[in-house]
Amino acid sequence: MRVVYLVLVVAVIIAITEAKSVKKSKTRSPKHPRHRTLADDYKLNRISAKYCKDYDDSCKAFGKIAKKDKKSCFNNPDKARMACPVSCKLCDKKTFHKKSKLSDVVVVRAMCVDIEVDQCNPDVCYTNPDWATENCRKTCMLCKPDIRGPCDTDPRCPFWGQYGYCSTATYIDNHCPYNCDVYSYVPEAPQPYPLPIEPLYAYQPLPYPTAPPGVTPATLPPYYENAPQPTYAPGAQYPAATAAPAPSAPGATAAPAPSAPGATAAPAPSAPEATAAPAPSAPEATAAPAPSAPEATAAPAPAPEAAPSEPEAAPAPAPEMAPAPAPEMAPAPEAASAPAPEAAPAPEAASAPAPEAAPAPEAASAPAPEAASAPAPEAAPAPEAASAPAPEAAPAPEAAPSEQPMPGKKSKSKPSKRKGVKKSKSGHKRHH
């Protein structure tokens, strides 16, 4: 038993030692770095300026793709390093620096030439500033041509020097030693540079400089003909003063606003005056207000549903019109039995053509729907017409029973039938 126990212990020890040796061999084996994105190993992806070139025609479009897109430089590090290092901004800066007396000022001394002559143009100075300051110093006017001397480290230095911004900010004075020296005679700008000078992050495009209004730039040095400027307009994220004309627009609209209601109030009283004139006229006047009826249809549409005609006359005309129709409605007993109180002005219109008793029932049937559809405008002049023919109202009661036999008989026939029913009922009772 002891021998078996010792054999097991030895086997376990051997297994443990072999496992440790395997782990050591794995740790010593070299690991190949896996670059998922450019941000993971940004320092390892930097390429020296001598070999930093674009080898593909589609690199410009490839470098402008957004960072979140799967086809961007960040998500395709192999293509960015091998084919498009310039457009993806992977070029390394290796220049000779000499510190001046001020610890925060760095003066770059290098040969002022264009290393990549084919790719250097005015647009590159602003679209890819890091690469342009190393490979396109002459095109971007960052130093004196063909001489080793101080060089600017920002492509906007020529613009800042021409307009006198060198002494307005320490960043401009420190990063633009050449152009600030060339344009030292230019007076200081009245205001500091309005746009942001330093980018918020490494891949943020620089805002294109725009000349201030009313300021002329200084003349260029004799060895430069044209200043580097982009061929397209500046970015829209820095708009001009568009808020100035905005307050003037509401002021112009506010002025005609009060005039509009005044213009509508003027023709309002003129309309009832025109209707008051044809009211006392012959039945020809009924044909004249026919076109005016559709205009009033919009107002009296809710009137028959609301039943009372007095609330309609109260808000539209003056308060004097409210008591006028009240006495006319009281003596008319037929108005209560009639379907609507609007029938009150109907007998007044019929009182004028008294001799024409024969066509009276036809006229009563025709204007009945018209009076219901447009009573609002005719109700206003009703009291005025009644006040004028006051003496003629005396013969009116004689014509009333002759002209209105039909409506009167219909109203009286109902109680007469009821009496007959009672008699018949009483007669039946007697027979029983």
UniProtKB/Swiss-Prot annotation:
Its main location: other. Nematocytes. In late planulae, transcripts are found throughout the ectoderm in nematocytes, with high concentration of expressing cells in the oral pole. In primary polyps, is expressed in nematocytes in the body wall and physa ectoderm and in the upper and lower pharynx. Residues 314-330 have a biased composition (Pro residues). It is found in: Nematocyst; Secreted. Residues 235-313, 331-408 have a biased composition (Low complexity). It comes from the Eukaryota. Keywords: Disulfide bond, Nematocyst, Secreted, Signal, Toxin. Residues 235-432 are annotated as: Disordered. Residues 59-91, 107-143, 149-183 form the ShKT domain. One of its GO terms (molecular function) is toxin activity. Disulfide bonds join C52-C91, C59-C84, C73-C88, C125-C140, C157-C176, C166-C180. GO terms for cellular component: extracellular region; nematocyst. Residues 409-432 have a biased composition (Basic residues). PANTHER family: KERATINOCYTE PROLINE-RICH PROTEIN. Belongs to the NEP3 family. Probable toxin. This is Nematocyst expressed protein 3-like.
